[in-house]
Amino acid sequence: VLDNSPYDGKLILDNTSYNKESWVEWGNLEKAEAIPGSLEFLKYASEKGIEIFYISNRYSEQLEATVNNLKKLGFPNAEKSNVLLREDDRSKSDRRKSVSDYYNVIMLIGDNLADFNDEFEVKLAEERTNYTDQMSDSFGTKLIVLPNPNYGDWESNGLFGGKSYSNQEKDSIRKSNINSY
């Protein structure tokens, strides 16, 4: 629900790639904005009596900053007990189970299929496709996939308009569209 695209913009501008140190630094700034529609949707759910949990692969050392960022934006249930961050394992399975052991989980929202089920973790494309087909009835009801603004088909079909560009031209187009901190 937090838009981390300024972090990716910073990586591009600095001509570097993801690393834990810079990721923690970004999270500790508490400057992420809400993904459009996420705040309104979760407030609506909360008003209807739904308990909200935030399961993220931000690192556990970012808990206080993440909770503060969520609170500043007005997200419901933005408490340490409801924000489940990564320890060592990037899999969200144990964190999802810690919620489902005490709550009836009615919906999962994420920008990565592995946010919903470990069957999607590091699988071949064909396996992921088959599993997606098996779960198709859950998409849009129990499983809500958020668009990921940082990478995916949107780049070739959206940003580049389906046209072919050299790597240098692509870099120039990307940089002209960056939102950074």
What spans do the regions from the language model cover?
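Alpha-helical substrate-recognition element adjacent to the catalytic core
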Residues: V1-D89, Y181
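C-terminal cap/substrate-recognition subdomain and adjoining C-terminal extension
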Residues: Y59, L63-Y181
